[in-house]
Design a protein with these regions (language model features):
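Structured mid-domain segments that build the active-site/substrate or prosthetic-cofactor binding neighborhood
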Residues: 34-141, 145
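Catalytic domains of carbohydrate-active enzymes that cleave complex glycans
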Residues: 113-268
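Gly/Pro-rich turn-and-neighbor structural signature
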Residues: 1-47, 57-58
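Catalytic cores of glycan-processing enzymes that make or break glycosidic bonds
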Residues: 16-19, 25, 59, 75, ...
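Generic structural signal for residues positioned in beta-strands
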Residues: 14, 54, 264-268
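Surface-exposed beta-strand edges and their flanking turn/coil or helix-capping segments
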Residues: 7-8, 28-31, 68-70, 105, ...
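A generic structural motif
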Residues: 18, 56-58, 89-95, 246-257, ...
């Protein structure tokens, strides 16, 4: 919501600015992004008008909660920008169920950032690496490489927190990197130090399998042999079974999966 132009704000009034319509791929302050063209002026002006200025931000996809949500490269930039423009606090609307992506990592990083919004980028990524090492064990570097790769693959598009997978990623680009994505997670699983670490790796891998299976669907159905199609269907079945095994919420609306092994996961 744009701030008023001809009146002030009462000192007892609290303003919560919602970012739901903005781009989660670009920094909010990037006015060249078509989804963020108004937020810079709005945040700056509200910060000048209102003492009790807060932000309602987002860090998950409520419609497609198991698709990758690659916003790690803008979290710190956005939080520091809010702080510099008079925001007094942030309510982060995130995943509330068992995460099939990186919900735990985001919770940790957001806690650190909100305690110290002026931390350096080097400190931020040191916190990330510390968590990854603790949560994913010896194979954490493969998970970090995957995170960096998905940030890169999602940079082609501008997307909101309710965007479909095809609105976040170019499926052709993801398909071209499918082998690399799978190899990184295979390596992370192989390096798991314990059963609990392996479970963490496998649960977080669900989002990777989800986007790969969604991205390669058209090519497999159009050009694949019958054996390749059967292998695709079997992988979908395995993915569905893993969702049930780890009790991962399909989306934040508590809707059940409309599973079909013959359809890409983004259509379930």
């Amino acid at each position: 919501m744009a701030p008023p132009e001809k009146c002030g704000v009462h000192e007892k009034l609290m303003i919560y600015y919602c970012t739901i319509e903005n781009c989660f791929s670009c920094p909010y302050k990037n006015t060249e992004c078509k989804l963020n063209k108004n937020i810079a002026k709005n945040i700056t002006t509200w910060g000048q008008l209102c003492e009790k200025f807060y932000v309602w931000d987002y860090s998950t996809n409520f419609w497609y909660s198991t698709t990758p949500f690659p916003n790690f490269d803008v979290i710190l930039t956005n939080t520091r920008w809010f702080y510099d423009n008079g925001v007094r606090g942030i309510f982060n609307n995130a995943i509330t169920h068992t995460s099939g992506e990186f919900g735990e990592l985001r919770a940790y990083l957001l806690t650190r950032i909100y305690q110290d919004p002026l931390m350096t980028e080097q400190e931020y990524y040191a916190h990330m690496d510390k968590f990854l090492q603790s949560y994913y064990g010896s194979g954490w570097t493969y998970v970090r490489q995957y995170i960096d790769l998905m940030e890169e693959l999602s940079s082609e598009k501008h997307w909101t927190c309710n965007a479909p997978p095809s609105g976040i990623f170019n499926f052709d680009t993801v398909a071209a990197n499918a082998d690399k994505i799978n190899a990184l997670w295979d390596s992370a699983e192989a390096a798991a130090d314990s059963a609990s670490i392996l479970a963490n790796v496998q649960r977080s891998r669900l989002a990777a399998t989800y986007i790969v299976q969604s991205a390669i669907y058209d090519d497999v159905m159009k050009n694949g042999s019958q054996a390749e199609k059967e292998a695709y269907y079997e992988k979908n079945q395995e993915l569905y079974n893993e969702y049930l095994k780890f009790d991962v919420a399909w989306n934040e609306r508590d809707e059940e999966i409309e599973f079909s092994r013959a359809q890409p996961p983004c259509n379930w």
